[in-house]
Design a protein with these regions (language model features):
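Extended terminal and domain-junction accessory segments
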Residues: 2-72, 183-225, 293-510, 516, ...
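Acidic-aromatic/histidine active-site loop/patch
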Residues: 74-77, 81, 98, 102, ...
């Protein structure tokens, strides 16, 4: 016989349940519900931790235009200050060149959303004879790996005069950007900001700044004119060919306030690192690649293409105008360029004095790890992530360990891998394998056993031509490495340091980007002579820092080895590649297959497919 409930229990229990239900209903009632009709205009808002995610709808119309045309710019080059603010007048470096625009904007639209908002981006390709995909740099896409935007890996390219709709969750807060992935360096100009903010209560550094304004974005890109000369653009603008011929990008601040600035180096055909500094001001570093770090104050920063840095600028100087300077690294003797912007206090009059650069004492460099740890040069090894290294990654060994040797091979005979007119028979590779894209997207394969026996490969299974010791044999295949879901992974990247490998004789650095994951930088070490690298250097790879920096893009210096670790928690096909279009599209890349097909999120049934087609055998009448 069950025990009889007391009168108190009979009354109190339902009352407690009723109170809990009432609280839940009140929270739901007061929390705005996502509206499927939301547009991008109402996604740029103060973020709140109790708010429902919004569905943010955008339309991207991609077109081919020209910079500084007479029709759009209306002869403004005769009076350069008239060019600023003219609709559809694209300044660039002041030269006439074909460019690619989104919604007739250059750079493309900046997307400002809150954490976990859902982006619905309808891409309309109006380019004649040019396909395109868009990659959402910094976003893991855990729910929608098919939206990663890697051609022939996660999707078919968006063909001319067709429309493709990307749907993804902005789950990774921070400073990011979207970009085209086509392998065409001309289309590297197709990019825009993707800023994912979080609520003030969840933002770890919110007390360190007063303002986080959309206009305080600094997006750098490398621009190459028709004559082959390169320069740096700041938000699509340059001072022009004749000094301050065109209006400089201006950032306004109010004396006494602290501002969060967001910097991204989006594209760089040369791969040349860039330094950034602001006269008379120090920079308080807050985050790298969207991942928060312990704050560190420096006077200047060096970064490579693909990287993002957030810093706080305190407007604590005299009311004036100050120079913001960006300059390519001294390593790049073939590309010695700089560009400027202006930091203006209290909307200072344009004729007021501009404070130029003074000597800078401390620098943060993400490029290399030489001369670190002192009071002058700070490297990635000197920064600390706010996220502790997981126990699964802190041991001597990991479940999976991969080594990639960056190589260049010369080919002869019929099997050649063409790059450009000056370099017809050279191919870049990882472990001697030049990545070749499949004829249909890997993510659309129906099962784990549906591989292409003639094209798929890994370090243990390669085509017959790859087995030869003859360097003249071309080893091209779809390089795929399988990794168990939730495995701890270690990647070692070896750079022998030959300058010509990097695609620029004066810049021996590579920079690699991993899709779908962030990784911890465990170690990066440069050697006087790469030939001295031995197993002893790599034998003990146990992390010595418990909160190594988290990144998705990393510079690989010459004559060095770099050790990265991550937990493979995101199932799908993820691209690991050199950052420049002319390298990743021509072999210096690999696909990491995380998990099995059953682990992958479902691809929509109507998802577009593509591939080879060979018609039936018949005779023409």
């Amino acid at each position: 016989m069950s025990p009889r409930l007391s009168w108190c229990e009979i009354v109190i229990r339902p009352a407690v349940v009723a109170v809990i239900v009432a609280i839940v209903l009140i929270i739901i009632r007061l929390t705005p519900f996502p509206d499927i009709k939301n547009t991008h205009a109402n996604c740029d808002r103060p973020c709140h931790e109790l708010e429902w995610p919004m569905i943010c709808r955008f339309q991207f119309i991609i077109e081919s235009r020209r910079s500084l045309t007479r029709k759009s710019c209306d002869h403004c080059w005769k009076n350069a200050s008239d060019c600023a603010g003219k609709k559809y007048c694209f300044i660039g470096d002041g030269s006439d060149r074909r460019i690619f625009t989104v919604n007739r904007l250059f750079p493309g639209p900046s997307l400002h959303v809150c954490e976990n908002d859902i982006l619905v981006v309808e891409v309309v390709n109006r380019l004649a004879g040019q396909s395109v995909t868009l990659h959402w740099r910094g976003q893991p896409l855990q729910e929608t790996p098919a939206m990663d935007g890697v051609p022939m890996v996660t999707q078919c390219p968006v063909s001319p005069h067709t429309t493709f709709q990307y749907k993804l969750r902005a789950s990774q807060p921070g400073t990011h950007f979207w970009q085209a992935m086509t392998g065409d360096t001309e289309m590297d100009d197709l990019f825009g900001a993707l800023i994912v903010r979080r609520s003030a209560k969840l933002e770890p550094h919110r007390t360190l700044y007063d303002e986080d304004k959309p206009e305080h974005l600094i997006y750098l890109s490398e621009w190459t004119s028709r004559s082959g000369q390169s320069t740096l653009l700041i938000n699509g603008m340059s001072a022009g060919k004749e000094g301050n011929f065109f209006p400089l990008q201006t950032y306004n601040v109010t004396e006494g306030k602290r501002y969060r600035f967001r910097v991204a180096y989006t594209t760089g055909h040369s791969g040349c690192p860039v330094s950034a500094q602001i006269s008379s001001h120090s920079l308080l570093i807050l985050a790298l690649d969207g991942q928060p770090t312990e704050p560190k104050k420096v006077d200047s920063i060096h970064l490579v293409p693909g990287e993002r840095i957030d810093f706080v600028l305190s407007a604590d100087q005299a009311i004036n105008r100050y120079t913001i300077r960006f300059k390519t690294s001294d390593w790049c003797t073939d590309l010695n360029v700089e560009n400027f912007a202006i930091l203006t206090y209290n909307s200072s009059h344009p004729s007021s004095k501009i404070i130029t650069m003074a000597s800078q004492s401390t620098v943060l460099t993400t490029v290399q790890d030489t001369g670190c740890g002192g009071h002058v040069t700070h490297c990635l090894s000197d920064l600390k992530s706010l996220e502790k290294l997981p126990d699964k990654l802190s041991g001597e060994k990991t479940d999976v360990s991969l080594t990639f040797d960056l190589q260049e091979r010369n080919y002869s005979g019929d099997q050649t891998f063409e790059f450009d007119e000056l370099d017809l028979r050279q191919g870049r590779s990882l472990n001697g394998i030049t990545f070749t894209f499949p004829s249909s997207p890997l993510l659309l394969r129906p099962s784990d056993n549906s591989s292409d026996e003639n094209l798929d490969c890994n370090d243990q299974k390669v085509p017959a031509t790859c087995a030869s010791d003859e360097m003249s044999n071309f080893c091209g295949c779809t390089h795929i490495i399988s990794i168990p879901l939730m495995a701890s992974v270690q990647i070692i990247i070896l750079n022998p340091g030959a300058n010509h490998l990097s695609g620029g004789k004066s810049n021996p650095n590579f920079f690699f980007h991993l899709h779908g994951q962030h990784f911890y930088l465990i170690q990066r070490r440069e050697l006087a002579e790469f030939a001295n690298l031995s197993e002893s250097h790599l034998k003990s790879t146990k992390p010595t820092i418990t909160n190594s920096v988290l990144k998705d893009t990393i510079s690989i210096p010459p004559k060095s080895f770099t050790i990265l670790r991550f937990i493979a928690s995101n199932p799908g096909y993820w691209f690991l590649h050199e950052g420049r279009s002319q390298l990743w599209s021509r072999g210096m890349s690999v696909v990491l297959k995380v998990g099995q097909r059953d682990d992958f999120p479902d691809v929509p049934e109507t998802f577009p497919s593509c591939g080879n087609w060979i018609g039936p055998e018949f005779f023409l009448a």
